[in-house]
Amino acid sequence: MRIGIISVGPGNIMNLYRGVKRASENFEDVSIELVESPRNDLYDLLFIPGVGHFGEGMRRLRENDLIDFVRKHVEDERYVVGVCLGMQLLFEESEEAPGVKGLSLIEGNVVKLRSRRLPHMGWNEVIFKDTFPNGYYYFVHTYRAVCEEEHVLGTTEYDGEIFPSAVRKGRILGFQFHPEKSSKIGRKLLEKVIECSLSRR
Protein backbone atom coordinates (compact mmCIF):
# COMPACT_ATOMS: atom_id res chain seq x y z
CA MET A 1 0.00 0.00 0.00
CA ARG A 2 1.31 3.44 -0.94
CA ILE A 3 0.33 6.52 1.07
CA GLY A 4 1.09 10.05 -0.12
CA ILE A 5 1.10 13.24 1.98
CA ILE A 6 1.03 16.49 0.00
CA SER A 7 3.91 18.67 1.17
CA VAL A 8 3.74 22.16 -0.34
CA GLY A 9 3.64 24.55 2.60
CA PRO A 10 2.94 24.87 6.31
CA GLY A 11 0.61 22.28 7.74
CA ASN A 12 2.16 20.08 10.42
CA ILE A 13 3.32 17.88 7.56
CA MET A 14 6.03 16.06 9.50
CA ASN A 15 3.69 15.59 12.47
CA LEU A 16 1.13 14.03 10.13
CA TYR A 17 3.86 11.92 8.51
CA ARG A 18 4.91 10.56 11.90
CA GLY A 19 1.27 10.03 12.91
CA VAL A 20 0.48 8.08 9.75
CA LYS A 21 3.71 6.10 10.12
CA ARG A 22 2.77 5.05 13.66
CA ALA A 23 -0.76 4.19 12.56
CA SER A 24 0.58 2.01 9.73
CA GLU A 25 2.76 -0.16 11.97
CA ASN A 26 0.11 -2.88 12.26
CA PHE A 27 -0.27 -3.16 8.48
CA GLU A 28 2.06 -4.96 6.07
CA ASP A 29 3.89 -3.44 3.11
CA VAL A 30 2.96 0.21 3.68
CA SER A 31 5.13 2.97 2.24
CA ILE A 32 4.62 6.67 2.99
CA GLU A 33 5.91 9.47 0.76
CA LEU A 34 5.86 13.27 0.86
CA VAL A 35 4.43 14.66 -2.38
CA GLU A 36 5.68 18.00 -3.72
CA SER A 37 4.73 17.54 -7.39
CA PRO A 38 2.53 15.25 -9.50
CA ARG A 39 3.60 11.63 -9.99
CA ASN A 40 2.87 9.32 -12.89
CA ASP A 41 1.28 6.75 -10.61
CA LEU A 42 -1.41 7.26 -8.00
CA TYR A 43 -1.42 6.54 -4.28
CA ASP A 44 -3.84 4.20 -2.56
CA LEU A 45 -4.39 6.93 0.05
CA LEU A 46 -3.60 10.63 -0.38
CA PHE A 47 -3.58 13.16 2.48
CA ILE A 48 -4.01 16.91 2.01
CA PRO A 49 -2.78 18.61 5.20
CA GLY A 50 -2.65 22.34 5.78
CA VAL A 51 -2.89 25.25 8.17
CA GLY A 52 -3.41 28.92 7.44
CA HIS A 53 -5.28 30.79 4.73
CA PHE A 54 -7.68 29.16 2.24
CA GLY A 55 -6.44 31.27 -0.68
CA GLU A 56 -2.82 30.52 0.10
CA GLY A 57 -3.54 26.80 0.34
CA MET A 58 -5.17 26.73 -3.09
CA ARG A 59 -2.35 28.85 -4.55
CA ARG A 60 0.25 26.32 -3.39
CA LEU A 61 -1.69 23.41 -4.87
CA ARG A 62 -2.12 25.29 -8.14
CA GLU A 63 1.52 26.42 -8.42
CA ASN A 64 2.74 22.87 -7.79
CA ASP A 65 0.33 21.40 -10.39
CA LEU A 66 -1.35 19.27 -7.74
CA ILE A 67 -5.02 20.13 -8.30
CA ASP A 68 -5.51 17.74 -11.22
CA PHE A 69 -3.33 15.18 -9.42
CA VAL A 70 -5.75 15.21 -6.47
CA ARG A 71 -8.76 14.99 -8.79
CA LYS A 72 -7.27 11.98 -10.60
CA HIS A 73 -7.25 10.13 -7.27
CA VAL A 74 -10.94 10.90 -6.84
CA GLU A 75 -11.74 9.85 -10.41
CA ASP A 76 -9.91 6.56 -9.82
CA GLU A 77 -11.82 6.07 -6.55
CA ARG A 78 -8.72 6.27 -4.36
CA TYR A 79 -9.04 7.63 -0.84
CA VAL A 80 -8.36 11.36 -0.45
CA VAL A 81 -8.24 12.80 3.08
CA GLY A 82 -8.16 16.51 3.94
CA VAL A 83 -6.93 17.54 7.39
CA CYS A 84 -7.66 20.97 8.97
CA LEU A 85 -7.24 23.50 6.12
CA GLY A 86 -7.01 20.48 3.83
CA MET A 87 -10.60 19.61 4.72
CA GLN A 88 -11.76 23.15 3.90
CA LEU A 89 -10.02 23.01 0.52
CA LEU A 90 -12.26 20.07 -0.43
CA PHE A 91 -15.20 22.50 -0.71
CA GLU A 92 -16.19 25.00 -3.39
CA GLU A 93 -15.23 28.30 -1.75
CA SER A 94 -14.53 30.08 1.54
CA GLU A 95 -15.44 33.41 3.10
CA GLU A 96 -11.77 33.68 3.99
CA ALA A 97 -10.79 34.09 0.33
CA PRO A 98 -13.62 35.57 -1.77
CA GLY A 99 -13.34 34.67 -5.44
CA VAL A 100 -10.93 31.77 -4.88
CA LYS A 101 -12.26 28.41 -6.03
CA GLY A 102 -11.64 25.38 -3.84
CA LEU A 103 -11.14 21.84 -5.09
CA SER A 104 -14.95 21.48 -5.31
CA LEU A 105 -14.80 17.78 -4.46
CA ILE A 106 -17.65 18.17 -1.95
CA GLU A 107 -20.59 20.53 -2.50
CA GLY A 108 -20.63 23.31 0.08
CA ASN A 109 -18.63 26.26 1.34
CA VAL A 110 -16.62 27.45 4.33
CA VAL A 111 -17.67 30.25 6.70
CA LYS A 112 -16.29 31.84 9.85
CA LEU A 113 -17.33 30.42 13.20
CA ARG A 114 -19.82 32.69 14.99
CA SER A 115 -17.96 32.74 18.31
CA ARG A 116 -16.02 35.81 19.42
CA ARG A 117 -13.51 33.44 21.03
CA LEU A 118 -11.43 32.54 18.01
CA PRO A 119 -9.59 30.54 16.99
CA HIS A 120 -11.30 27.43 18.30
CA MET A 121 -8.22 25.84 19.84
CA GLY A 122 -7.79 22.78 22.04
CA TRP A 123 -9.52 19.50 22.74
CA ASN A 124 -13.17 19.10 21.84
CA GLU A 125 -15.59 16.24 21.35
CA VAL A 126 -16.38 14.74 17.95
CA ILE A 127 -19.53 12.64 17.58
CA PHE A 128 -19.31 10.42 14.50
CA LYS A 129 -22.27 8.86 12.71
CA ASP A 130 -20.28 5.68 12.10
CA THR A 131 -16.90 4.11 11.27
CA PHE A 132 -14.61 6.31 13.39
CA PRO A 133 -14.15 6.52 17.19
CA ASN A 134 -16.10 9.15 19.12
CA GLY A 135 -14.04 11.17 21.56
CA TYR A 136 -11.95 14.28 22.11
CA TYR A 137 -9.70 15.48 19.30
CA TYR A 138 -7.40 18.50 18.97
CA PHE A 139 -8.62 21.54 17.00
CA VAL A 140 -7.06 24.79 15.76
CA HIS A 141 -9.31 26.69 13.33
CA THR A 142 -11.44 29.79 12.76
CA TYR A 143 -13.57 28.67 9.81
CA ARG A 144 -16.03 25.79 9.44
CA ALA A 145 -17.69 23.87 6.63
CA VAL A 146 -21.32 24.23 5.57
CA CYS A 147 -22.62 21.29 3.54
CA GLU A 148 -25.54 18.94 3.02
CA GLU A 149 -26.33 16.58 5.89
CA GLU A 150 -25.54 13.56 3.70
CA HIS A 151 -21.87 14.60 3.70
CA VAL A 152 -21.61 15.20 7.47
CA LEU A 153 -19.70 12.33 9.07
CA GLY A 154 -19.12 13.88 12.50
CA THR A 155 -20.11 16.99 14.45
CA THR A 156 -18.66 19.17 17.20
CA GLU A 157 -20.13 21.96 19.34
CA TYR A 158 -18.17 25.11 20.11
CA ASP A 159 -19.57 28.09 22.00
CA GLY A 160 -23.14 27.04 21.16
CA GLU A 161 -22.51 26.38 17.47
CA ILE A 162 -22.65 22.85 16.07
CA PHE A 163 -20.57 22.33 12.95
CA PRO A 164 -19.33 19.45 10.74
CA SER A 165 -15.95 18.42 12.14
CA ALA A 166 -15.73 15.44 9.77
CA VAL A 167 -17.17 15.03 6.29
CA ARG A 168 -17.37 12.28 3.72
CA LYS A 169 -18.38 11.87 0.11
CA GLY A 170 -17.60 8.39 -1.16
CA ARG A 171 -13.87 7.92 -0.64
CA ILE A 172 -13.25 11.61 0.05
CA LEU A 173 -12.81 12.29 3.78
CA GLY A 174 -12.23 15.51 5.68
CA PHE A 175 -11.27 16.07 9.31
CA GLN A 176 -11.31 19.62 10.71
CA PHE A 177 -9.30 18.50 13.74
CA HIS A 178 -5.71 17.22 13.80
CA PRO A 179 -5.64 13.42 14.26
CA GLU A 180 -1.84 13.54 14.38
CA LYS A 181 -2.07 15.74 17.50
CA SER A 182 -4.90 13.79 19.10
CA SER A 183 -2.98 11.13 21.03
CA LYS A 184 -4.26 7.54 21.09
CA ILE A 185 -7.68 8.30 19.64
CA GLY A 186 -6.08 10.13 16.72
CA ARG A 187 -3.93 7.08 16.03
CA LYS A 188 -7.02 4.85 16.12
CA LEU A 189 -8.74 7.12 13.62
CA LEU A 190 -5.75 7.05 11.25
CA GLU A 191 -5.60 3.26 11.57
CA LYS A 192 -9.27 3.14 10.56
CA VAL A 193 -8.58 5.38 7.56
CA ILE A 194 -5.80 3.03 6.42
CA GLU A 195 -8.06 0.02 6.99
CA CYS A 196 -10.85 1.60 4.90
CA SER A 197 -8.39 2.39 2.12
CA LEU A 198 -7.02 -1.15 2.09
CA SER A 199 -10.51 -2.62 1.86
CA ARG A 200 -11.60 0.10 -0.64
CA ARG A 201 -14.89 0.55 1.19
From Swiss-Prot:
InterPro entries: Class_I_gatase-like, GATASE, Imidazole-glycPsynth_HisH. It is found in: Cytoplasm. Its EC number is 4.3.2.10, 3.5.1.2. SUPFAM superfamilies: Class I glutamine amidotransferase-like. Gene3D superfamilies: 3.40.50.880. The keyword Amino-acid biosynthesis applies. One of its GO terms (cellular component) is cytoplasm. Keywords: Amino-acid biosynthesis, Cytoplasm, Glutamine amidotransferase, Histidine biosynthesis, Hydrolase, Lyase. It catalyses: 5-[(5-phospho-1-deoxy-D-ribulos-1-ylimino)methylamino]-1-(5-phospho-beta-D-ribosyl)imidazole-4-carboxamide + L-glutamine = D-erythro-1-(imidazol-4-yl)glycerol 3-phosphate + 5-amino-1-(5-phospho-beta-D-ribosyl)imidazole-4-carboxamide + L-glutamate + H(+); L-glutamine + H2O = L-glutamate + NH4(+). GO terms for biological process: L-histidine biosynthetic process. Its main location: cytoplasm. GO terms for molecular function: glutaminase activity; imidazoleglycerol-phosphate synthase activity; lyase activity. Signal peptide: none annotated. Heterodimer of HisH and HisF. IGPS catalyzes the conversion of PRFAR and glutamine to IGP, AICAR and glutamate. The HisH subunit catalyzes the hydrolysis of glutamine to glutamate and ammonia as part of the synthesis of IGP and AICAR. The resulting ammonia molecule is channeled to the active site of HisF. This is Imidazole glycerol phosphate synthase subunit HisH. It comes from Thermotoga maritima (strain ATCC 43589 / DSM 3109 / JCM 10099 / NBRC 100826 / MSB8).
